[in-house]
Amino acid sequence: SEMKEIYLDRTEKNNSKWLELITDALKTSKRFEIHCWNEETDWIEFALKYGTLKESTWRYGKVIEGDVTPEFVTMILEMPKPTDIEIYNKMTPFFNIFLDDIKFQSCHYGTEIYIEDEMV
């Protein structure tokens, strides 16, 4: 199926548009995957409270997977917008968040979103 692409750039003052999109996707999602760079140790540790390490061929990072639980949803939706926005205007501290494999993809800290067309 087709993927719809949405880009959130520097003009976004907050992450409300990102939150709106992921809130919708979380309602029907069963599983999540979070990708963090190896040096993002705090976020890896944090994500591991909600899932487990997945075997991955990505040498430069870690992949955490788990069930979309009410606790996970709350964590994602209540996470404040990051303030380290020099490189990316980050919407989330997590590099990638995938829901139900690739049905919903929040990439590059939420600056690029891909949504399966049925969901739009």
Regions found by a protein language model. Name each.
Residues 1-120:
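Structured alpha/beta or helical-core interaction and ligand-binding surfaces enriched in interleaved
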